[in-house]
């Protein structure tokens, strides 16, 4: 599967996750979010950028429990809780945000 | 809820030549979501999984060794490395990557996750477990 | 003859068997997990060090790097080669035996 944007083709798996991490750019993130009726604002980007940094360092996408705790440590308790994160990403913060961040589905997510 | 079960994942294979190491690590990360009492043991060639400075770029394989540093985030913070296995391979603790976890109860103090244990200690630890899985 | 060994000497007897059968004009190339046989200070170091008086032993650099093994950890006398060196060895020898 794939989608096209500004003449560039992005390969995806059957669930819409980018097949090739290095293809990711902000336009792709905005496009994938739009497909889910989600307009990315700065709060979304905060989480997306966090996930990309996490992947860069550890080579895995964190499970939701790990993400919540790490966000809390970095951005404060008012953001490091599942209510806040689920409001931003109603399909599941790890799953949905990882998709827009161009990462594979988090390890342990089914 | 019933009491958390004590899980030990035993890693016995070198990191790159087979899929045991990466598959085992994935199972540990997935299993950590179930909030059980999890530890890992590294024996035999498994101790090579913790070798510092692994760089797979020239082989075209993915380097998954940074993922061991995420284990602390998953609350897997007891990694037992068998002393005899290190010695047999000419390794010391200094050859291993430093792995730590942050103790939230002590203002995120960084603590080491690596414990070098001898065979007798490891046997005792195995006796304490409810479930032992080998990779 | 070129011999390649791709198993860890701690897991398999292939390195030991290979070295006991390799003749003086042989090249022995350690690849994949076989590169653990190049480690100095290990239980198998003496086996390889003794063979070095007889055969030439090489280790493949990308496989060493993938496993975090730097050159200073290797048994002196082992030559480190890249993929190009692997090809040269394969061409220079009339036969290849892979100790799988």
PLM-predicted stretches and their roles:
Chain C
Residues 5-8, 62, 100:
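Structural motif
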Residues 35-49, 69:
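N-terminal beta-loop-helix "entrance" segment that forms/cooperates
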Residues 67-100:
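C-terminal structural segments of small proteins and small subunits
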Residues 20-24, 47-54:
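Short, conserved loop/helix-junction motifs that constitute active-site signature segments
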Residues 27-32, 55-63:
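Short internal beta-strands
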Residues 1-15, 34-40:
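Short, glycine-rich nucleotide/cofactor-binding loops
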Residues 1, 26, 94:
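Conserved acidic residues
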Residues 17-20, 42-45, 73-75:
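Short, glycine/charged-enriched secondary-structure capping and boundary segments
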């Amino acid at each position: 599967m794939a989608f096209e944007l500004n003449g560039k083709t992005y390969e995806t798996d059957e669930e819409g996750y980018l097949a090739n991490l290095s293809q990711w750019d902000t336009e792709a993130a905005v496009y994938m979010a739009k497909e889910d009726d989600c307009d990315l604002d700065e709060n979304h980007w905060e989480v997306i950028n966090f996930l990309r940094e996490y992947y860069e360092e550890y080579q895995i996408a964190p499970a939701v429990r790990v993400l919540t705790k790490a966000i809390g440590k970095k951005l404060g308790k008012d953001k490091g809780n599942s209510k806040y994160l689920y409001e931003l990403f109603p399909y599941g913060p790890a799953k949905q945000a990882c998709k827009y961040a161009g990462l594979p589905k988090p390890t342990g997510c089914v | 809820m019933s009491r958390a079960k004590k899980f030990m994942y035993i890693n016995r294979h070198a990191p790159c030549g087979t899929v045991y190491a990466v598959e085992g690590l994935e199972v540990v990360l997935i299993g950590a979501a179930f909030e059980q009492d999890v530890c890992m043991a590294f024996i035999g060639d498994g101790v090579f999984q913790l070798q510092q400075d692994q760089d797979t770029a020239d082989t075209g394989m993915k380097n998954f060794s940074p993922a061991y540093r995420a284990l602390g985030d998953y609350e897997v913070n007891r990694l037992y490395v068998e002393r005899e296995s290190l010695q047999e391979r000419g390794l010391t603790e200094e050859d291993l990557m430093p792995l730590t976890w942050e103790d939230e109860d002590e203002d995120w103090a960084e603590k080491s996750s690596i414990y070098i244990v001898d065979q007798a200690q490891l046997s005792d630890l195995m006796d304490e477990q409810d479930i032992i899985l080998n990779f | 003859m070129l011999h390649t060994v791709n198993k860890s000497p701690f897991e398999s007897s292939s390195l030991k068997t290979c070295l006991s059968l390799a003749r003086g004009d042989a090249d022995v190339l350690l690849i994949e997990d076989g590169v653990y046989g190049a480690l100095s200070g290990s239980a198998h170091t003496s086996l390889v060090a003794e063979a070095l008086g007889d055969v030439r032993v090489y280790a493949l650099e990308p496989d060493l790097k993938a496993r975090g093994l730097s050159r200073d950890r290797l048994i002196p006398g082992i030559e480190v080669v890249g993929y190009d060196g692997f090809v040269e060895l394969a061409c220079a020898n009339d036969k290849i035996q892979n100790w799988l």
